[in-house]
C-alpha cells in the first residue's frame, strides 16, 4: 500500500 498516495487522497477529500 502506498501511504503517501493514500494520505494525499485523504487530504484532498477534506
From Swiss-Prot:
Localization per record: Secreted; Target cell membrane
Positions carrying Leucine amide: 14
Keyword Membrane: yes
Expression by tissue: Expressed by the venom gland.
An individual GO BP term: defense response to bacterium
Molecular function GO labels: toxin activity
KW Mitochondrion (keyword) present: no
Source domain of life: Eukaryota
GO cellular component: extracellular region; membrane; other organism cell membrane
Keyword annotations from UniProtKB, A to Z: Amidation, Antibiotic, Antimicrobial, G-protein coupled receptor impairing toxin, Mast cell degranulation, Membrane, Secreted, Target cell membrane, Target membrane, Toxin
Function description: Antimicrobial peptide. Has activity against both Gram-positive and Gram-negative bacteria (B.subtilis (MIC=15.5 uM), E.coli (MIC=70 uM)). Shows mast cell degranulation activity (EC(50)=15-26 uM). Has moderate hemolytic activity (IC(50)=45 uM). Its mast cell degranulation activity may be related to the activation of G-protein coupled receptors in mast cells as well as interaction with other proteins located in cell endosomal membranes in the mast cells.
Note: Most of synthetic analogs show a decreased antimicrobial and hemolytic activity.
Family designation: Belongs to the MCD family. Mastoparan subfamily.
Protein name, per record: Mastoparan PDD-B
Organism: Polistes dorsalis (Paper wasp)
